[in-house]
Amino acid sequence: MHEPHLDRRLFLKGTAATGAALALGATAAPTASAAPGGFPDYTYVRTLLTPSQLAYNPTGEIIFPTVRGVYDRLPASGRLGRYYLYYAPHDAPGGICLAYGDSLEGPFREYPHNPIVSNKWSPHYSVSHVSSPHVMWHAGRKEMWLYFHGENTTTRLARSTDGIHFTYDKVVLNTSMLPSGTTETSYARVFPHELPSRVAHYVMVFMVNNTTNHRDIGWGWSADGRTWTFAQEPLVRHGDVGAVNVGGPHLLHRNDSTYVVYNKDKESGGDLMITEVGNDFSLRRHLGVFYDSRGSAPENGRAAAPSFGTDHGVPYMIYEAGERLAGAIAMARG
């Protein structure tokens, strides 16, 4: 499968990488078998987190993992492990959670004080739930930037110097910034990506829904990661790939081009799909299935919301496995 694009150190190191690279966005190490776009194929290995085994388990489900290597970003004295894995329940009250480990193979240990961000944060908001954590390392600020939603109409930003304790920043996306009739703007991921023609250094991809109740992939661009401009037309439409709904997008970069990987709803196949958008986001080349979800547990016909990283040169995909709102966090190896 792929690798992420924005923090290029990961995959640009390819097979020569000796440390684990975070999965913000990079170029994947070559393998004998390749997925569309020349990315390595990923094969399911094991489940990393199961709701029933977690101390903080308000709803019996967890979604939307983001894995980040912190071994060379955070001071060793306060670091819990080489990798931080963020995830959340979705249903109320949700809550942004953290697990940590020293290898992308696992095991990951639950942070004992989850949730690290809750659905009530006075005086900033009080909502039914917060979920879908995406954490980006901001190299210029030397901070971990957390993008998350709550409600599904609103995507927010909080910032941290240690990846655990966050300070609220602002709303970065809500339905009022998209065309009339938009009902959801959530499940966002943000990546460093240069768009010179738009004077932008960051790109956001996210799920957008409207009154037709068919979910598409939206996108936007920003000079600073805080103030955004959003395309008023979807980046990927559900009908373009034969789905009722698409979501969980992630950018990847390989062979001097940019791709978006995203999931279909289970009824439409439950697979991860890939579309080449190009470095300037002018392409719409739908390349088909990126990862074919298995019918057996834990996937049970659905894989979603992938995050990517490398560990000692080996590419990994950490993703949501199983029925919508009944799944676990799984790991596949390239």
Tell me the role of every PLM-derived stretch.
Residues 1-6, 17-24, 33:
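N-terminal secretory signal peptides
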Residues 34-128, 136-186, 191-243, 253-300, ...:
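Beta-rich carbohydrate-recognition and catalytic domains
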Residues 133:
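Short, solvent-exposed interaction modules
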Residues 246:
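Donor nucleotide-activated moiety binding/catalytic core segment of transferases
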Residues 303-306:
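Extracellular glycan/ECM-engagement signal in secreted proteins
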